[in-house]
């Protein structure tokens, strides 16, 4: 574990520049730089994931009394004809997903996004990111991403993680983390105030996509959920549905 060093690059700040100051359009200069920053086309894959309507962000919202379909908000008029609501025990799986172009009304999307970035609520707000597997992937099961713990259930992450441990033992485990002498405001791969996961060694396209949404800035999250509407943002206020969300991932 590297200790006492200074963090050279603020990834959160850099990724926040993906969109312009108004949060309406992409910053082409920053996008071009990020293509080069991450290896093996990782940014290309993550960015594509954010644009393919295969990423679903669920927020636990127990005080939301306008939730539809047993806690999952989705406009019936805007669901693709080939898709079903995520109500009950349904999760985004092949043939059963909510491809809402607007998810819910704009005000609700904005409110949920604010909860995830407000300094007073973000640490208390439960959220889950589910990625629907695509045809090219070996497993058709939904992929679970926990960016706070820097964990992903995909094969790419598992191979990366196990490879470090098997090849380097305890040294490999220690090398997974970086500890800095001063507290940093870079939230990218952040474990606590002074420690980050070494994202150059432990990362996958799903984690990078999730970090772009949740560890950068509010304008970036709103760009993909409200402006481009390529990431679906839902609220859940029913405990049974919240538990089913996790049980389906285990299955």
Swiss-Prot record:
Q: Which GO terms describe its cellular component?
A: nucleus
Q: Could you tell me the superkingdom of the organism this chain comes from?
A: Eukaryota
Which keywords has UniProt assigned to this entry? DNA damage, DNA recombination, DNA repair, Nucleus
Please tell me whether the keyword DNA damage is annotated for this protein.
yes
Where do the coiled-coil regions begin and end?
none
GO BP term, pick one: DNA repair
Q: Where in the cell is it found?
A: Nucleus
Stretches for region Disordered: 83-105
Leader sequence residues: none
Q: What does this protein do?
A: Plays a role in a RAD51/RAD54-dependent homologous recombination repair (HRR) pathway to repair MMS-induced lesions during S-phase. Required for error-free repair of spontaneous and induced DNA lesions to protect the genome from mutation.
The record's family statement is: Belongs to the SHU2 family.
Q: Under what name is this protein listed?
A: Suppressor of hydroxyurea sensitivity protein 2
């Amino acid at each position: 574990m590297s200790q006492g060093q200074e963090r050279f690059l603020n990834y959160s700040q850099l990724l926040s520049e993906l969109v312009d100051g108004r949060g309406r359009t992409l910053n082409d200069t920053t996008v071009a730089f990020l293509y080069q920053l991450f290896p093996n086309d990782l940014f290309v894959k993550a960015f594509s994931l954010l644009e393919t309507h295969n990423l679903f962000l669920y927020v636990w919202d127990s005080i939301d009394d306008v939730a539809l379909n047993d806690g999952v908000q989705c406009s019936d008029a805007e669901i693709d004809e080939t898709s079903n609501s995520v109500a009950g025990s349904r999760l985004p799986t092949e043939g059963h997903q909510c491809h809402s172009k607007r998810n819910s009304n704009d005000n609700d999307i904005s409110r949920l996004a604010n909860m995830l970035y407000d300094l007073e609520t973000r640490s208390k707000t439960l959220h889950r990111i589910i990625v629907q597997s695509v045809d090219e992937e070996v497993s058709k099961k939904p992929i679970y991403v926990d960016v706070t713990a820097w964990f992903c259930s995909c094969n790419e992450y598992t191979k990366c993680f196990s490879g470090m441990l098997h090849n380097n033992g305890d040294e490999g485990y220690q090398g997974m983390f970086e500890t800095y002498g001063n507290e940093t405001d870079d939230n990218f791969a952040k474990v606590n105030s002074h420690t980050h996961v070494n994202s150059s060694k432990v990362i996958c396209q799903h984690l990078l996509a999730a970090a772009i949404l949740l560890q950068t800035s509010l304008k970036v999250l709103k760009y993909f959920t409200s402006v481009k509407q390529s990431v679906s943002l839902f609220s859940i206020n029913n405990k049974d549905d919240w538990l089913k969300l996790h049980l389906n991932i285990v299955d």
